[in-house]
Amino acid sequence: MKLTRASQAPRYVAPAHHEVSTMRLQGREAGRTERFWVGLSVYRPGGTAEPAPTREETVYVVLDGELVVTVDGAETVLGWLDSVHLAKGELRSIHNRTDRQALLLVTVAHPVAEVA
């Protein structure tokens, strides 16, 4: 078992994210995992992730607040415990259009070369 306390989770910089704090809960710099890593993103009001293709298969789960996820031009509003699965390469952006922070659980598969 590998425990990561939120207070000790490594922070990292997510490229093209603005007004978003990110921490790694499992995997990568938080400790080895075999197939995926898990992170938590805190989107402040107005926080965004610019449009970018997903590098690997990805799952988002909103733990608190509301986020607008745009995938290939179609907007979807996600609220408490809503989730979305993105295949590798799907073009997505994320925006917090509310006046309160939103928490997003992020799970991303490791590249196939790392899993093998």
Curated annotation (Swiss-Prot):
It is found in: Secreted, Cell wall. Disruption phenotype: The knock-down strain shows significantly lower biofilm dispersion compared to the wild type. Keywords: Cell wall, Glycosidase, Hydrolase, Secreted. It catalyses: Hydrolysis of terminal non-reducing beta-D-galactose residues in beta-D-galactosides. Its EC number is 3.2.1.23. One of its GO terms (cellular component) is extracellular region. This is Beta-D-galactosidase Rv1717. It comes from Mycobacterium tuberculosis (strain ATCC 25618 / H37Rv). The lineage of its organism: Bacteria, Bacillati, Actinomycetota, Actinomycetes, Mycobacteriales.
